[in-house]
Amino acid sequence: MGKPGRVNQTTVSDFLLLGLSEWPEEQPLLFGIFLGMYLVTMVGNLLIILAISSDPHLHTPMYFFLANLSLTDACFTSASIPKMLANIHTQSQIISYSGCLAQLYFLLMFGGLDNCLLAVMAYDRYVAICQPLHYSTSMSPQLCALMLGVCWVLTNCPALMHTLLLTRVAFCAQKAIPHFYCDPSALLKLACSDTHVNELMIITMGLLFLTVPLLLIVFSYVRIFWAVFVISSPGGRWKAFSTCGSHLTVVLLFYGSLMGVYLLPPSTYSTERESRAAVLYMVIIPTLNPFIYSLRNRDMKEALGKLFVSGKTFFL
């Protein structure tokens, strides 16, 4: 809700991102840690995309969505970390008004797309395990492209609408955001005008981007587990579980981190806790994803090996 009691209303040209620490001596350490994780995220996800695109054996629905998930993870991390690194390097906390809205839009869009792709990948595993005879028709290239397009539309439109609604909000002279990125809830706390519509939009996006994909994932894995336990052969069970083990690991890490923070009692809320949660699902998990999908997957390891061999041959 807006704060009608505030009368010091002004046209805001920029905001201040307070970052993760107020201590100057900690800034070089934070810069090194986040630069390292960002580079690992970008290189790891780029290698997955190159390995999948260069190996014809990986031109399947599962790896098609994995390549798009890797691209989404790279874009999601790039929406916030480079600006944080630039602010630390220049010893500045400023982000322009337009830059803040642009960052918010990309974070919402790619964050929502990440969730949507995780749900689609769970459905892909459900069809592969529970309906193997219909897999080629149920997950045809045309349908995969359609599902990807639907995910882009479903995440882009609400993110754009929320960002446009923020342009109608009047902000007060106070413009400090206690995060390393433009958090929508923190932005609304700086508003001087009514924000009921914006808050309703945040709730709607939470349901659309988090709750609906999670329900689809849970439904898919309930059906998968039921189908796997019917299999009498231990080898068959292991093969079925191995096809979705990496995806399930990523899902548990991502949603587990969110629930571990946001389902705690409101009395324990703090900006520090929310910042740590943001670091976990915006930086650490995208950094781990390439390792999870490559180290636990024989086909990916073989494709990466071929990619490195071809790279050495090219440079030699």
From Swiss-Prot:
Pfam families: 7tm_4. It is found in: Membrane. InterPro entries: GPCR_Rhodpsn (IPR000276), GPCR_Rhodpsn_7TM (IPR017452), Olfact_rcpt (IPR000725). The chain crosses the membrane at residues 29-49, 61-81, 101-121, 146-166, 200-220, 244-264, 275-295. Residues 1-28, 82-100, 167-199, 265-274 are extracellular. One of its GO terms (molecular function) is G protein-coupled receptor activity. It is a multi-pass membrane protein. Glycans are attached at N8. It comes from the Eukaryota. Residues 50-60, 122-145, 221-243, 296-316 are cytoplasmic. PROSITE patterns: G_PROTEIN_RECEP_F1_1, G_PROTEIN_RECEP_F1_2. Disulfide bonds join C100-C182. Keywords: Disulfide bond, G-protein coupled receptor, Glycoprotein, Membrane, Olfaction, Receptor, Sensory transduction, Transducer, Transmembrane, Transmembrane helix. GO terms for cellular component: plasma membrane. GO terms for biological process: signal transduction. Belongs to the G-protein coupled receptor 1 family. Odorant receptor. This is Olfactory receptor 1N2. It comes from Homo sapiens (Human). The gene is OR1N2.
